[in-house]
Amino acid sequence: MADINSPLEIGVTTGPIRGSKKIYVGARTGSGVRVAMREIQLEGGEEPVRVYDTSGPYTDPEVSIDIQAGLPALRREWIMGRGDVEEYAARAVKPEDNGQLGPDRSGGVPAFPNVARTVLRAKPGQNVSQMHYARKGIITPEMEYVAERENVGRAKLETAPDGQAWGAEIPQEITPEFVRDEVARGRAIIPNNINHPETEPMAIGRNFLVKINANIGNSAVASDVAAEVDKMVWSIRWGADTVMDLSTGRNIHDTREWIIRNSPVPIGTVPIYQALEKVGGIAEDLTWDIFRDTLIEQAEQGVDYFTIHAGVRLPYVPMTAKRVTGIVSRGGSIMAKWCLAHHKESFLYERFDEITEIMKAYDIAYSLGDGLRPGSIADANDEAQFAELYTLGELTKRAWEQDVQVMIEGPGHVPMHKIKENMDKQLEACGEAPFYTLGPLVTDIAPGYDHITSGIGAAQIGWYGTAMLCYVTPKEHLGLPDRDDVKVGVVTYKLAAHAADLAKGHPAAKVRDDALSKARFEFRWRDQFNLSLDPDTAEQYHDQTLPAEGAKTAHFCSMCGPKFCSMKITQEVRDFAAKQNSDSYLASENIKRETSAEEAEEAREGMSDMAELYKAKGERLYLPESEAD
């Protein structure tokens, strides 16, 4: 049994991602804002490739990482400089905050040692949301940071974007003014609680790069704060743009504090989970006062967005009765049970405007939960799902009336032919507020492979306009993901998000693809590894069959071998054509001098002779060495 006052040993992965270095780019506005990026170093005189980076200070060897102290408060001066916040004494931590209904805190985890004694909130009559600033015409440092971050790679563009954007309005260049306008219109959010100054600002919206979220958190059967902090750092190393702490069971408050203080990305939660723990897991005992207290507790800690299942209304619950899988959302089922037990409208719906007042005092974004999402393809696009969606649209407009940022959560389990309807209806119902979907899974027959079944749907709905994709790991429906599962889920969803960016014609999306393709053709193996989403696995697979160091410079791989490598043969064809300097049109590069008539005729005769030889040898593409002369 852990001693609540004992030190906590937490080890996280630090150091540069292989083949890369952390760089900081100054905003072009000259404001002094410095934006973190990753630069992949290439061989053969090739210019390095810059990529969007979510890993925070953990990949900067110049930064000393101390998990006990937390990360530097990057945004503190920006927040205080606006003059619209006040400091006050933080709410005292109660035993029930950690799922302990009595005074005994044994079995808990050590409290974070560097907890702030005072926290921030808006001054009376003030609104500190990024949407409020945007609507007042103010470009904040957060907006400048986002603009510079989203422009990565665009300076090297040589070709026009190629894709189908489905109505998205993606500019050739992202400016701070464009970011401000998107936030003001509600088409994008910058989730940044004023009590989470450690965050590096990012935007979620369909006119920006598609983002991904990773879920972590303990459960009633597995609770280890060290493992959860490690999973957070591990997930952002591989590309998670936000992280949701879905902890249930005990130690929720303390686990969340460790995570937030060490997270450079926005942290989301589902507050109803913790509220339920405070009443011993009995949904009927939930009250507005307990829920409100939980919101303030988490707001003071610095949670950046809340999933609120306010669209699960009493009249909609009977609509799920004939479903194959009923209500599969934990938050949705909690509120449905409460509504039926009391036969009353949900207090989340009835008190929505009061929740919004709390959100704007801390700049917390709504993630309006899809508590009635389909849990099987049989239930996709049904009456209950879309009834809730249109209610979420109504609530979005109410939140916008108070300048509070909103994104909308979506399914779920949806077969491919029904996915676009989800996107179209969400845009219509919710006024283009960012869509945030869990997959969707396109089939239900692959437990153990649901990162793939959902990745297919995620790429598709991301192309249609979803702004953020919530990852699914191989453990979905089976168990709690471990560190390896987290990596697989993140990399799978980075792939889906990138595929969506390519399909939308997002400027600069192809830069990394083209660099890797060129490295592949030129047999620059290390560059291929380093440009990939997972360099370690790429090299590991290569070395399973060709482990020798010399294989890293070989002009073939184990798939085809030296004699059958199509790219090596193509290079030889190019070299031959260029050497012959003929008009055979085989050379893909421009010939630097004119071909004489005599040379052209000689080349034609030579090719005619070789064509006859090819026929004489049985029209075989490859010959044994004994017959090659």
Swiss-Prot record:
Its EC number is 4.1.99.17. [4Fe-4S] cluster binds at C557, C560, C565. InterPro entries: ThiC, ThiC-associated_dom, ThiC/Bza_core_dom, ThiC/BzaA/B. Pathway: Cofactor biosynthesis; thiamine diphosphate biosynthesis. GO terms for molecular function: 4 iron, 4 sulfur cluster binding; carbon-carbon lyase activity; zinc ion binding. Residues 589-610 are annotated as: Disordered. Substrate binds at N215, M244, Y273, H309, S329, R330, G331, D370, G371, L372, R373, E409, Y436. HAMAP family: ThiC (MF_00089). Catalyzes the synthesis of the hydroxymethylpyrimidine phosphate (HMP-P) moiety of thiamine from aminoimidazole ribotide (AIR) in a radical S-adenosyl-L-methionine (SAM)-dependent reaction. Belongs to the ThiC family. This is Phosphomethylpyrimidine synthase. It comes from Erythrobacter litoralis (strain HTCC2594). The lineage of its organism: Bacteria, Pseudomonadati, Pseudomonadota, Alphaproteobacteria, Sphingomonadales.
